[in-house]
Amino acid sequence: RVEDNSSLFGIRGTEDLGGGLKAFFQLESGFRLDSNNSSFATRNSGIGLQGGWGSVLMGRWDMPYKVAGYPADPYVLLTLAGYWSSVQDSGNFGRRPQNVVQYWTPNIGGFTARVAVTANEGKTATVDPKDFSAMIGWARGPIVVNVAYEKHEDQVGSTATAGAEEEGLMGVVSFKFGGTKISGIVERIEKTGRANRENFYVSLVQSIGKHDIIGTAGQTKGGQANGAAGSEPKADAVSIGYRYNFTKRTQMNVLYAKIKNNATSAQNFPLLPVPGVGNGSDPEGVSFGIVHVF
């Protein structure tokens, strides 16, 4: 099976309003060349104001929790092997909700933070679904450290459910020395009616001139329904990739990725699932792509 799931097109712009204030906008869409059935502004799209006090954004945008993991992910959603597309519970904690309001602080001594809340548009007499997400980060030279928290109220995944809660806590570290970058993510997810889920992910990028050799390994375990029979679900994910940087704006990527499930786990590639994957299955895939930024 051949799929095109990571082609993107976007535009952005700013206007100087004077007095240190700027307006900014972005419209970004994912599109599929193989099926031509894409919608408009499905990715980070919004409008906001920016000043010395920080930025305020309204629209559809990645939550701070999701953004916190970017420094450790050498693929950042573009392939089968990224954190959010291999071991993470992306159906719940890789969100890009619509009608979100976010505040981003300015950089203060290397520290930055983001906070986001969503509109509770699905509110009824019995449920009031809404999200809260926040991250704080510190970067100095080759070191990046991020911590993030997110909570979903009255929700199980994208389904409104009275009394249900989902919470996630994530820690991210990335360190670069010379042409080598080593990164890691540790995450714990708690959900009503389920055992805690723990995720681990490490990545290594070795740059030699225009060539990047990339390796990743991750594990997810737990998350089963309370009282479920059998052993604890566990899945291991690995990948090996190569990137050639033609210029600063154009690169080529190729990689191989595989997920190995134990007898009670059915982890799949969340962004591009392989059909028919059940407990104990081991999905795998090859990805090839070209990125050009203009």
Residue ranges and their predicted role:
Residues R1, V76-S90, E166, V186-K191, ...:
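Extracellular/periplasm-exposed beta-strand and loop segments of Gram-negative cell-envelope proteins
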Residues R1-N120, D128-K130, G137-V144:
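Outer membrane beta-barrel
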Residues G10-T14, G48-Q50, Q102-T105, A116, ...:
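Transmembrane beta-barrel domains of outer membrane proteins
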Residues N37, A68-V76, V127, T159, ...:
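Outer-membrane beta-barrel and related beta-rich outer-membrane complex signature
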Residues V127, D131-N245, Y256-K258:
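Detector for outer-membrane/organellar transmembrane beta-barrel domains
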Residues I240, F246, G278-F294:
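Outer-membrane beta-barrel "beta-signal"
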Residues F246-M252, Y256-N268:
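C-terminal beta-signal and adjacent terminal beta-strands/loops
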